[in-house]
Amino acid sequence: GSRAQVDKNDFSFMDHGQKIIPDFAYITIHGTPGENGILQGYFELLGIPYSTCDVLVSALTFSKFTLNQYLKGFGVRVAESMLVNKRHGISDEDVIAKIGLPCFIKPNASGSSFGVTKVKTKEQIQPALEAAFKESDDVMIEAFMDGIELANGCYKTKKNEVVFPITEVVSQNEFFDYNAKYKGEVTEITPARLSPELTSRVQQLTSAIYDILGCKGIVRVDYIITEGEKINMLEINTTPGMTATSFIPQQVRAAGLDIKDVMTDIIEDHFN
C-alpha cells in the first residue's frame, strides 16, 4: 500500500488523481482524540458517520469520576471515589480519611492505564498524585476493591443486540496496568469462570449501561466482582482494543462470530 496526505478540511485524500471522501469512519484510536469526543465532533462537523458513541457520551465516559457519579444515579454500583484538581491538591491525611488505604490514584481522563498507581502507604500518595497529574489536570482517588476482574463487550444495531461472552482478567501485577494490557503480563479467560446466574447478571448490566448512556458501536464495560457476588462497574471503554489478542476479538471468537462480520454489521446499520 501507499500513504496519502489527508486534507483535514474535509478528511479527503487523493488516490491516482481522484479525490476520495470516506463514506464512514471506523474509529479505533484510544485516549485523545478518539475516545473523548474530539474526533467524534470533527466527524459531526464534516457530516461523516462514524462507528463509536457520540460526542457527549464519549466525553462522559472518558471522565471516570463523572461517569461514576452519573451511573450511581441509576443504581449502578461503583467504588467510593473523589476528584482532586491539580491547582488545589490534597493532603495525605484527607486521602486516608475520605477514601482509605489501599486506594487507586489515577488520571480522571486518560487511556491505557497511564499514570495509574495502587497506593498502599501514606508515603506513596504524593508521588502517585504527581504521576497522575502528568496525564490529567484532574485526578480520581478511588477506594480499592478486592475481587474478580471482568470485561464484557456489547454492541447494538436497529435489528440486533449482541452481548459477548465475559472475559476474566487475572493480572500478574498489582492491577490491570499498562504492562498487563500491552505486554502480556496477564491471563485472560474467555468465557469467564462464573456461574450461569452471575454471567447473566453481568451481561444484563452491560446491556442496561449501554442503553442508559445511549452508546453506539462496540463498547466494553469493566467490572470487579466483590464478596457476595456484588457487581461493581470500574470503567467503560467506548473504543476498546481491537488487536487479535484484545478482549473484544477474544469475546467475538468465543461467541462463534467473526470480527469482520461484526464490524460490517455496525457499518451497515448506519446505511440501513
Model-derived regions, located:
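Short small-residue beta-strand/loop micro-motif enriched in glycine and branched aliphatics
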Residues: S51-T52, S112-S113, T187-T190, A244-I248
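Phosphate-binding site of ATP-dependent enzymes
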Residues: K120-Q204, I225, K230-N232
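Hydrophobic beta-strand scaffold residues
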Residues: P49-Y50, V78, C103, I259
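Active-site nucleotide/adenylate-binding loops and adjacent lid/helix of ATP-dependent enzymes
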Residues: D15-K19, S58-I148
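ATP-dependent carboxylate activation and anion-phosphoryl transfer catalytic cores
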Residues: G75, P196-N272
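A glycine- and small-aliphatic-rich helix-loop capping segment at beta-alpha/alpha-beta transitions
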Residues: G41-Y50, T121-Q126, A254-A255
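ATP-binding N-terminal substructure of ATP-dependent carboxylate-amine bond-forming enzymes
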Residues: G1-L56, L60-F62, T66, N85-E93
